[in-house]
Design a protein with these regions (language model features):
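Terminal, regulation- and interaction-focused segments at domain boundaries
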Residues: 1-12, 59-62, 104-115
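Short, charge-patterned binding micro-sites
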Residues: 32-61, 93
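Ordered, amphipathic secondary-structure segments that act as subunit-interaction surfaces
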Residues: 53-109
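A contiguous pocket-lining binding segment that forms or flanks enzyme active sites
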Residues: 109-141
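Core RNA-modification/binding signature centered on pseudouridine synthases
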Residues: 2, 7-10, 35, 39, ...
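N-terminal, positively charged regions that mediate nucleic acid binding
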Residues: 1-42
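Helix N-cap motif at beta-to-alpha junctions
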Residues: 64-69, 113-117, 170-171
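Short amphipathic alpha-helices in soluble, non-transmembrane regions
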Residues: 69-80, 120-129, 180-182
Length: 220
């Protein structure tokens, strides 16, 4: 079963544990995990980085018996303990790729003081360039310039202080929306600092998308 859910604001920070406990409380007939047979087998979607929020998160759970999707949703809602909001439950083929492997793009909304920066181009024009550079600076002072153009499918201005970014998985790798925004604002990115963010900005992942052979995106 593919579960789409949302973590309540100011809720748990350990989503993996919250999902595991929810499945255990639900009483659903689950397949056991390989490491601990008392735990359910499940696979979470791509995790959020530090300083990011999400409107939709994903988990695939493996059941040992056929249970209607409506019943699965009802039992998970009852077992969520006020930490998670179940948005959708869908039966998917057993051999279907996990969300981790299926996701080809992610859409983020970014809100912050863009008007406080001297920007020569709109975000649309900036990311429409043939090459878009981000600068990474190490603690030793060495700088690395990286072309992040392959990772940015689209950029859109929503209002003066809010944009939307569609980021792609390119050759199995992602960049964070923080990296894209830093590039646009002309801010250097500290290399190898996973907890780094662009101060004063909020980053919300609206959803993950799979891509067909024609390049069209579909919400997972």
């Amino acid at each position: 079963m593919r579960i789409v859910f949302r973590v309540l604001k100011n809720g748990t920070t350990n989503v993996f544990k919250a999902v595991r406990e929810m499945i255990l409380r639900s009483g659903l007939p689950f397949e056991p995990a390989k490491i601990n047979k008392q735990w359910p087998r499940f696979a979470c979607g791509p995790s959020l980085a530090v300083h990011q929020q999400a409107l939709r998160e994903y988990v695939d759970i493996y059941l040992s018996a056929l249970v209607p999707a409506e019943e699965v949703q009802r039992k998970l809602e009852e077992a969520s303990a006020g930490e998670l909001v179940i948005l959708n439950v869908q039966r998917v083929p057993y051999a279907m790729p996990s969300v981790q492997n299926l996701a080809a793009a992610a859409i983020y909304s970014v809100e912050g003081p863009f008007t406080s920066f001297t920007l020569e181009q709109t975000v649309e024009n900036y990311f429409n360039a043939s090459r878009v550079e981000a600068v990474y600076r190490s603690e030793t002072g060495l700088a690395l310039t990286k072309n992040i153009k392959p990772y940015v499918l689209q950029a859109q201005t929503l209002c003066a202080d809010k944009i939307r970014l569609t980021l792609a998985c390119a050759e199995g790798k992602w960049i964070s929306p923080q990296e894209a925004v830093a590039s646009y604002l002309g801010i250097e990115i500290p290399a190898q600092q996973e907890d780094w963010t662009v101060e004063g900005f909020t980053f919300v992942r609206e959803g993950l998308y799979w891509q067909d052979s024609q390049g069209a995106l579909y919400l997972i």
